[in-house]
Every structure is written in C-alpha cells, then in structure tokens.
Amino acid sequence: MEQNKDPQMISKHNSRLPIWVLSPREEQQARKNLKTETYKKCANFVQAMADCAKANGMKVFPTCDKQRDEMKSCLLFYQTDEKYLDGERDKIVLEKINKLEKLCQKQSSTK
C-alpha cells in the first residue's frame, strides 16, 4: 500500500476533525488500494479472460462471454461490498494513528 510519506502530514492534520476522517486524497487512495487488492484476488479470472481474448481476437465477445461474466462477477463482489472498502479505509486510519504516535513519542523524547 503506497501512502503519502510526508512527515508533516500529521502535523498539518486539522485538530478540529477526528483523525478517522479521511481527506479526499486519502479516500481516493483507499479506493485505489481496493482496486489493486481486488485484481489480486481475482487474478485467475482476469488471466482467463485475457487468455481467451488473446486466443480469439475479434471474436472475443461472443466467445469469451463466460470468462467475462466470471471476471466481472468476481471484481464486482469485492468492489461493491462496503466491508472491503471500509477495510482499506481502516488501514489508512491505522497508518495515520501510527504516524501520530511516532510524532508524539519523538516530541516527548526531545523535551
């Protein structure tokens, strides 16, 4: 999971908002992470569709309907169920909490 590694991100965090509130950029990152994870989980279906398309060329759509439907079903299963997106959001929130804890420890050790 690729995140913004800017150490100032936590210090710039708006203290009036709870840390679990995601910025639009963080929400976009959660959705991007979900897409990546979904394609990993459905890799066999995606590969089957790609192989069928490669083998059939211009006849891909009538010939590969079964593979397309299986791939679509798998991808939509993960992308439409909110618990998977919530899981990606939780990962980002946990990362923000960890960064904040490290920052607090660093500040307390310098005092």
Curated annotation (Swiss-Prot):
GO terms for molecular function: metal ion binding. Belongs to the CMC family. A motif (Cx9C motif 2) lies at residues 64-74. Residues 39-82 form the CHCH domain. InterPro entries: Cyt_c_biogenesis_Cmc1-like. PROSITE patterns: CHCH. Required for mitochondrial cytochrome c oxidase (COX) assembly and respiration. Binds copper. May be involved in copper trafficking and distribution to mitochondrial COX and SOD1. It comes from Saccharomyces cerevisiae (strain RM11-1a). The lineage of its organism: Eukaryota, Fungi, Dikarya, Ascomycota, Saccharomycotina. It is a peripheral membrane protein. This is COX assembly mitochondrial protein. The keyword Membrane applies. A motif (Cx9C motif 1) lies at residues 42-52. The keyword Metal-binding applies.
